[in-house]
Amino acid sequence: MVPHSATPTPDPSPQGGGEKALPSLPCRRLAEPFEALRDASDHMLAKVGARPKVFLANLGKLSDFTARAMFAKNFYEAGGIEAPGNDGFKDQAVMIAAFKASGAKLACLCSSDVIYAEQALDAAKALTAAGAIVHLAGKPGELEAPLVEAGVKSFAYIGCDVVSTLQAAHDILGVK
């Protein structure tokens, strides 16, 4: 048996009268910003016959770039930006020729930290010289300042502001 308390339980209903009820927050789905980006991509497809595109500048062997290339593909495609795959580039001249042939304005470097340390600066400079707006998949770490100096404009990584990065990419690519 539960003992009876002599203290009355408080009434959960508001007392008094001078208190104002706050308006409720609007209902918003977390996917809405991504849906808006994909809708803008659909509009571009209907208008010009092609979606916005990013060139994946995959450096090194398949095992070097696969993780970040898949991350970058999913990252950009979540915002309606096509990210066609490729087998990677061991030669910078071949990468630049493939970038030019792709018709993309945006290029994203994809590889391992080891390959980034060896090749990312030169690749970023070459892509920038070829007319690319260069992004890099992954956190830049100690290479951030030299990468930015070499032409990298943005970094796509887990924990970054995905929506603002994709919106900036849409702006670069002329997606309205």
Model-predicted regions and their roles:
Residues K125-K176:
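Peripheral docking tails and interdomain loops at the edges
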Residues Q92, I115-K125, T165:
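Active-site-adjacent beta->alpha loops and helix N-cap segments on the catalytic face
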Residues M70, A93, L121, G141-E142:
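Residue-level marker for well-ordered alpha-helical positions
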Residues P84, E118-Q119, L127-A132:
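Internal alpha/beta domain cores that form substrate/cofactor-binding pockets in large enzymes
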Residues K61, V114-I115, G141, V162:
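Residue-level marker for beta-strand->alpha-helix junctions and adjacent short loops that shape enzyme
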Residues M95-F99, A123, A169:
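Generic hydrophobic alpha-helical segments
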Residues M1-P8, E19-V114:
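Non-catalytic terminal/interface segments that mediate subunit docking, oligomerization
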Residues S13-E19:
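Short, low-complexity intrinsically disordered segments enriched in A/P/G/S/L with frequent Arg
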